Amino acid sequence: MRHGKSGRKLNRTTSHRKAMFANMAASLIEHEQIVTTLPKAKEIRPIVEKLVTLGKRGDLHARRQAIAAIRDTEKVAKLFSALAPRYESRHGGYLRIMKAGFRTGDNAPMAVVEFVDRDVNAKGATDHERKVAKVTEKEDS
């Protein structure tokens, strides 16, 4: 019987699932918006919302718990310095999940996960810089 069992397995082992959620949380904190499948989006929401709550707490123990969860000190620094002050007056509900149609190929339901009051410049800025650097590198060769 599955009484009291919560969460989806997503056809992955426990360690793979934990690593995937850590990577997704880090990407969401960095870019403030990600596109993923709807079941993954529904699973990542409570994880990231708890991380933002840790950021709002702001003490050393909360910082260490956040580092243990996502394993990226740069993202944790952004969480505590940029995201936590932004959501200081908001009690939960930091993320928005919007359905984004179906993926070509396997028809999987897709979703956009984003922070409610996100910085629109956070998404794509580093990606654009990386792309420009790659293009100039190809032209130089």
Swiss-Prot record:
Pfam families: Ribosomal_L17. InterPro entries: Ribosomal_bL17, Ribosomal_bL17_CS, Ribosomal_bL17_sf. PANTHER family: LARGE RIBOSOMAL SUBUNIT PROTEIN BL17M, RIBOSOMAL PROTEIN L17. One of its GO terms (cellular component) is cytosolic large ribosomal subunit. One of its GO terms (biological process) is translation. This is Large ribosomal subunit protein bL17. Keywords: Ribonucleoprotein, Ribosomal protein. One of its GO terms (molecular function) is structural constituent of ribosome. Part of the 50S ribosomal subunit. Contacts protein L32.
